[in-house]
């Protein structure tokens, strides 16, 4: 009986599913393709274009824009191009003195060796976290606008444990944001000092207070090189091409120093000796007569020191190091400028005290090379109440990693800085202050010709006989001969050396000139 009941249950179940089978058969029968339609060829082309556009619309998100590739420049045809001739004619418009006084390096481009080192560092890091760290350290507020980014590093942590957790991340963010900006400003100052002091000024050893991730190290390596200036390709410059023999970096911020060491791991250094230490030691001192090729420098570090006593101690260490050239750089803020002005005042005071002591040194005293044209009191320095800042600006062509870290599409940025370059020895004295060499350029020559033409007396035409011998008028002969002067008797090198000595007394523009208003120092 149980078996019969089970058979009836299965039979009823099969009857319930029969419509579904019939529906399946009907669907299968109607699934045959319809015969193709004979469409007009123009309509077929239109449908094909629409299909292609819809297919492209559903593709994956757009790929990021490609970066520019560095193509080696062929210098063989440089002299024959019209572009170079146009540049030379444009430079000839200025007088030699104006050209010497206005020479600058332009926008700074980070060498590929440094870019590759920083790119490798960023590749090994957490990029979203890197952007957050960069905003936390170098941006004021939550907005991603470029105007809120700064290059000052003044972070303070509550405990050593917190400092230890953040030091590697902070160092990576510093190398991605602050190092390129600091590098450009330091390069600008060193190149200007090199221009002002002449080809005889060479540096083989650098002592750096506030080394951080090595901004000064890289800038010094790319400023002092073995080849002549015409043969150097700065973008492809390598550490091995530098004439620097020794570098001492002094900094207590272990996180920044560790990143600075990592940036040098894959670089070929040859015989360059690099040392990192937490403080200045007595054995770092150099005898005074051996310091002619030694540079003592501190860049963007004075503002990070806790008080004036620490800043004063740093400046004294630079003076006692034995280096003949001392450079201090800080941000072009009120605080940064006051730090530079106070350091300048202290160095001049130490130099004056040394001259008055009567002790015999191989070189005594000191003087300001740049930017001041004097060794007197700074007219803009009023501690605590000053509003004016003696500052300068340097443009940097942003590498790709800077734009990506800041989430910005702008290809350049400007960094403001204040600085002073001090050199041991008394200030050069100009014996003849009335000489003004190199004051006439192409524009001045055209004006002189116009004045001569205006003074020329109009002469009447006379009949000329072929039998008469040609006679040159004395006035015409005098005009055709160049006027004698010191400029014509000097070679370009001699003229540049004379202008270099004369530039010690040239006034400096300390503010952007306004219409009919110029402020000089």
Region locations from a protein language model:
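Conserved beta-strand signature within the Rossmann-like core of class I S-adenosyl-L-methionine
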Residues: 322-332
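Conserved class I S-adenosyl-L-methionine
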Residues: 201-212
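A short SAM/SAH-binding and catalytic strip from SAM-dependent methyltransferases
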Residues: 292-309
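Class I SAM-dependent methyltransferase Rossmann-like catalytic core
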Residues: 158-198
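N-terminal mitochondrial targeting presequence
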Residues: 1-56
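C-terminal lobe and adjacent flexible extensions of AdoMet/dcAdoMet transferase-like proteins
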Residues: 399-521
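Conserved SAM-binding loop of SAM-dependent methyltransferases across substrates and taxa
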Residues: 213-240
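S-adenosyl-L-methionine
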Residues: 253-290
């Amino acid at each position: 009986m149980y078996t019969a009941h089970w058979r009836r249950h299965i039979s009823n179940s099969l009857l319930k599913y029969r419509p579904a089978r019939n529906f399946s058969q009907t669907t299968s029968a109607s699934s045959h393709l319809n015969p193709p339609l004979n469409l007009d060829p123009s309509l077929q082309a239109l449908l094909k274009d629409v299909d292609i556009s819809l297919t492209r619309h559903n593709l994956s998100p757009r790929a990021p824009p490609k970066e520019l590739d560095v193509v080696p420049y062929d210098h063989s045809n440089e002299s024959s191009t019209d572009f170079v001739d146009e540049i030379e004619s444009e430079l000839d418009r200025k007088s030699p003195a104006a050209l010497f006084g206005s020479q600058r390096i332009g926008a700074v481009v980070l060498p590929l060796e440094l870019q590759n080192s920083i790119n490798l560092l960023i590749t090994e890091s957490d990029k979203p976290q890197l952007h957050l760290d960069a905003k936390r350290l170098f941006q004021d507020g939550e907005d991603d606008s470029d105007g809120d980014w700064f290059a000052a590093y003044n972070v303070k942590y509550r405990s050593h444990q917190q400092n230890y957790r953040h030091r590697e991340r902070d160092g990576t963010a510093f190398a991605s944001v602050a190092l390129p900006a600091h590098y450009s400003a330091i390069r600008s100052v060193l190149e200007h000092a090199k221009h002002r002091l002449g080809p005889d000024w060479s540096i083989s050893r650098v002592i750096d207070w506030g080394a951080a991730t090595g901004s000064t190290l890289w800038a010094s390596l790319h400023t002092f090189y073995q080849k002549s200036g015409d043969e150097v390709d700065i973008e492809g410059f390598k550490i091995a091409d530098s004439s620097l023999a020794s570098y001492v970096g002094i900094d207590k911020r272990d996180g920044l120093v560790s990143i600075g060491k990592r940036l040098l791991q894959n670089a070929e250094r040859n015989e360059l000796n690099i040392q990192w230490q937490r403080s200045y030691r007595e054995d770092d001192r150099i005898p005074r007569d051996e310091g002619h090729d030694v540079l003592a420098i501190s860049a963007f570090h004075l503002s990070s020191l806790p008080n004036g006593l620490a800043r004063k101690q740093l400046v004294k260490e630079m003076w006692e190091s034995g280096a003949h050239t001392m450079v201090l750089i800080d941000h072009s803020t009120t605080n940064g400028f006051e730090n530079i002005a106070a350091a300048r005042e202290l160095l001049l005071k130490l130099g004056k005290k040394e001259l008055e002591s009567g002790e015999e040194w191989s070189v005594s005293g000191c003087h300001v090379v740049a930017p001041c044209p004097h060794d007197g009191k700074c007219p803009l320095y009023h501690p605590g109440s000053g509003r004016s800042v003696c500052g300068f600006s340097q443009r940097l062509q942003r590498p790709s990693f800077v734009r990506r870290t800041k989430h910005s599409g702008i290809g350049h940025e400007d960094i403001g800085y204040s600085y002073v370059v001090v050199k041991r020895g008394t200030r050069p004295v100009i014996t003849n202050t009335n000489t003004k060499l190199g004051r006439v350029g192409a524009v001045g020559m055209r004006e002189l010709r116009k004045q001569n033409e205006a003074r020329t007396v109009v002469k009447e035409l006379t009949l000329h006989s072929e039998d008469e011998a040609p006679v040159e008028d004395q006035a015409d002969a005098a005009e055709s001969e160049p006027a004698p002067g010191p400029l014509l008797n000097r070679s370009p090198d001699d003229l540049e050396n004379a202008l270099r000595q004369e530039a010690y007394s040239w006034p400096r523009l300390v503010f952007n000139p306004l219409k009919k208003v110029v402020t000089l120092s």
